[in-house]
Amino acid sequence: MEVEASGTEDNGDGGAKEPEAVVSIDTETKEAADEAKSQETVPQTPTTSSDSSSSGGGGEATDGTPNAESADPPPPPPPPPPPPPSTPADSTAAAASPAVLTEMSPPPPASTSSSSSTPAAPINLLDTCAVCKQSLQNRDCEPKLLPCLHSFCLKCIPQPDRKITMPVQGPHGQDTRIVNVMRCTVCHQDYKQIDMVDNYFVKDTSEATNTSVENSTQVCTSCEDNASAIGFCVECGEWLCKTCIEAHQRVKFTKDHKIRKKEEVSPESVGTSGQRPVFCPVHKQEALKLFCETCDTLTCRDCQLLEHKEHRYQFLDEACQNQKGIIATFMTKLQEKRGLVEYSASEVQKRLKEVAETHKKVEHEIKIAVFTLINEINKKGKSLLQQLESVTKDRSMKLLSQQRDISVLAQQIIHVLNFTNWAITNGSSTALLYSKRLITYQLRLIMKARVDAVPPANGAVRFFCDPTFWAKNVVNLGNLVIEKVAPTAPPSNMMVNQQISPGHNHPGKHSGQINLAQLRLQHMQQAAIAQKHQQQHQHHQQQQHQHQHQQQQQQQQQQQQQQQQQQQQQQHQQQIQQQMRIASQMSQHPRQGAPQMIQQPPPRLISMQALHRGGVNGSSHMFPPHHLRMVSAQNRMPSAQPRLNGQPYPMMQPQLQRQHSNPGHAGPFPVASLHNISAANPTSPTSASMANAHMHRGPSSPVITPIELIPSVTNPENLPCLPDIPPIQLEDAGSSTLDNILSRYISANAYPTVGPTNPSPGPSTHSPGSSGLSNSHTPARPSSTSSTGSRGSSGTTVDQVKVKQEPGVEEECSYSGANVKTERTKDGRRSACMMSSPEGSLTPPLPILGSVSTGSVQDILRTLGENVKSEPQSDNLSSCTNPNSRATLTNGTSGSNGGQRGGATNANSQTTAGKEDDPNEDWCAVCQNGGELLCCDHCPKVFHITCHIPTLKSSPSGDWMCTFCRNLANPEIEYNCDDDPPRNKEKNEMAMSPEEQRRCERLLLHVFCHELSTEFQEPVPTSVPNYYKIIKHPMDLTLVKRKLQRKHPLHYKSPKEFVSDVRLVFSNCAKYNEMSRIIQVYDEEKQSNVQADSEVAEAGKAVSLYFEERLLEIFPEQTFPVVMEKETQIEAEKEDSDDSDDDIIQPKRKRLKVDTEMLLHIK
């Protein structure tokens, strides 16, 4: 249904029936129009039917736009819902005052016909007074529409809240006028009284309802007599009474019109034409049928000829269509803003959930700590009570024995005294003398009995404890550590200040993307400047032998220029990095030597290798697999993150998600940076020395510096409000202006081919990322197979290399004779690494761009040897610099013929061959990451050389099979692994046999490949509460892997030791989680807290069962009984000792003799 509303703001003070805002309603739905065409009626004639009325009555309002809009069905009240796909075409226009914003759509005119199709809640909100809750479809209620789009009856309109003075343009210049300010009782928004208009949506809907449903009560719409209509003019679209029909037929202009009887009129032909026309307030007899574009108001024909003479005007239908387009644009913008608001609401909800989860977690930890202390206090109290009872019982027994002896003696004395006294007083002399001997003996015997007059005092038993000391220290029992997050740019700027042009093809994009593209272009321009300086410096190096003295002067000048240029570039880079840091929170890791290294020219941006499993998976293998393994590329990054950059990882993750939602910043595009690799990779013994040597070396000495990528830790796919802008796809040459600029820049600065006769070849960085840069900038590049058979100057050929190329991957890394796999990331993005030379202005770029090396292996090694002969060699460096290794990374190194680029036209067809029939998997079987992988020739599994067990020293040559496929008794191949046994013969004799070693390696590799074993591959972080208090002998699979190597000092002597350690990993997990169940007694929310720890416990049980099954399969002839853990034995012995009386420190005998009042100290 089409609705037009327009009003003027400066015509008066808003009457009840003839307000300043004059509104004209002309309704028409798509369905009604189609049906009208099928009925051969005039298209301009609006019709009223139950179907058309059910779509919104007087029209449906747009979502927060200044005009009303109709659609099927009407949207619910705010927040505004997204419009249906057909809404922009059916949206209505309203040229009202700027202060009026509509948000509502009136209900269907007939409740009987629309009750089944339209929900009741939106109807009540749209056609009901917000104060008295009465229906507004009454003609006498005078419905009013407020600027906040709430409808009120005229009697329910709130009284003016205050008055303000507004400047107005008067006849004599600037003037002021007092305006009433009112406040909506529903939404409490302030508005001016003059901005309030009649709600013609409801009024005309009510009239349309009465006319379309009850034809018997239809009144004439051509006159003002309110006479009953008996006919309907099809051409005019008006109901006519008997008098009007006669007049209609008499007038020459309308006498040919077709008039139907009321009973014959179909609802489709009537439509909403039963609405009364809105008449001009000046010319009472003229309807408002024109729209003045100049004045933005509805006019009648007379007004257009008089007051609006020579103004631009349109008919209502044409103006309605124009306003529809404007409204559709506003709707698009508002829908985008609605998405941002909903995303912000969801983020707030997430933060609330995080707060609740943090509360539960910390509460759980506090209860564990308190419960642990309570347990220890109870134990100590029971032990003290037991010791006290033992001491007092012993003393009581001794005193009771003395008491019995004394009682017996006292009775004996009384008896003897009584008998003697009776014998003396009552007995005869003969009897006394006769019994004297017995009486005297008994008296002497009792007299000899030794009785102490004062028994020895008891030794004092005292309890020494300072309650005040413990009460004071309870304050320091535990503290809450609240980590502060770095301040970020307010997200409101992103939502409020975004401007989207009407009719934009991509409504999801924001203006901040232009800044991002400019940022990238600035980086490339800086890299171009650095490239020019590199050329100049290389030129000075070539002339060094001829003009040594002149070279020194030029070198000093060049260094000064470089320092100035580097300072400028460093300042600009710091500004850019600050913006990048605000957007992605990826600040550079503070390393040793960073101030010296940061003086390099700013590196180019690197297209991020896709994130994997929601964790921190950047470029997993920046080097070939036998290079330094980057810690930042692993799934277990959170444990290493606080050590690397000093910032807690869990608190950083939500902040990154908020900052990535701001499209005005750099987004998820990491920057290559130079770092001290030894901090990230402890297994590299010489990388630190190389970095330090580079810092103390002059600018003319070449060096191979490892490059570390800082990956973004936020998956952009999880951010719905991010702009839908793809990263710079450097592989698709010519696809964008940036790509063309980049291609021209690279081709203009490319060096000629460096052959073996070149006196000073430029050193190149042995990095697949660097070679990926070379290949990605060329529109067409030859594949690795195109270099087969090509010869260098020495006449030797490069061995053909099988490269597993995934769809969409433009980066190639070749190994001689081995199957090397370059993977695309899991989210489908191409792994195109674009970086500058790591030496900055000190090192020239790669000699050949876009082509695979065609020179011989010996030439390459000799060329590299000349460049790095002054550098210390590391075991972890690429075997490209080792002449003894046959597995050579040929991609990215210098060839001998620059004309090889001419064969680049067949590159794409060759690289895409064989992609579909590749039987190998796409991800490493252990770490589930992509990168350069070794493909087994007998099974589909692939591995990184550092993930395989045993770990390989370098990439193998020829056919290769994994540990799963190799024969245990008689292996087909021997691995080139850095696992030389110790020279001590005794240790070799005590070690496992080679077959047992291979069996243990296969069993451990099975465990590593289990999908639930990730939690057990690394040591448990110290942040896990009370873990190292409960677990006294921690163990992890990586430690088992190291101990399985024969060079390890604690190498396993038998498979039983190996099995025992693996079982210890899972028993520790079960023990820790079993301990956590004790907290149920003191926890109010038992199930939730226990369930939080049960996931790792269930994973431990599953992997343990899997390990036992594989153990029976690999060692069928051996049995490995479960040995009681050392910790359990120690605890059992400790409990036995606690129950005994040995813990009581007995008093020394020397003090017993000296001091009878000895103090007995009890533990």
From Swiss-Prot:
Residues 534-548 have a biased composition (Basic residues). A zinc finger (B box-type) spans 215-268, 275-316. Residues 991-1114 form the Bromo domain. Zn(2+) 2 binds at C280, H283, C303, H308. Residues 1133-1144 have a biased composition (Acidic residues). Residues 45-54, 88-99, 524-533, 678-691, 753-797 have a biased composition (Low complexity). Its EC number is 2.3.2.27. Pathway: Protein modification; protein ubiquitination. Residues 580-590, 870-889 have a biased composition (Polar residues). The keyword Plastid does not apply. Residues 72-87 have a biased composition (Pro residues). A zinc finger (PHD-type) spans 921-968. Zn(2+) 1 binds at C220, C223, C244, H257. Residues 345-369 form a coiled coil. GO terms for molecular function: DNA binding; transferase activity; zinc ion binding. Residues 27-38, 821-830 have a biased composition (Basic and acidic residues). Keywords: Bromodomain, Coiled coil, DNA-binding, Metal-binding, Nucleus, Repeat, Repressor, Transcription, Transcription regulation, Transferase, Ubl conjugation pathway, Zinc, Zinc-finger. Its main location: nucleus. May act as an E3 ubiquitin-protein ligase and a transcriptional repressor. Involved in the regulation of embryonic and adult hematopoiesis. Required for normal development and survival of both committed erythroid progenitor cells and posterior mesenchymal cells. This is E3 ubiquitin-protein ligase TRIM33. It comes from Danio rerio (Zebrafish).
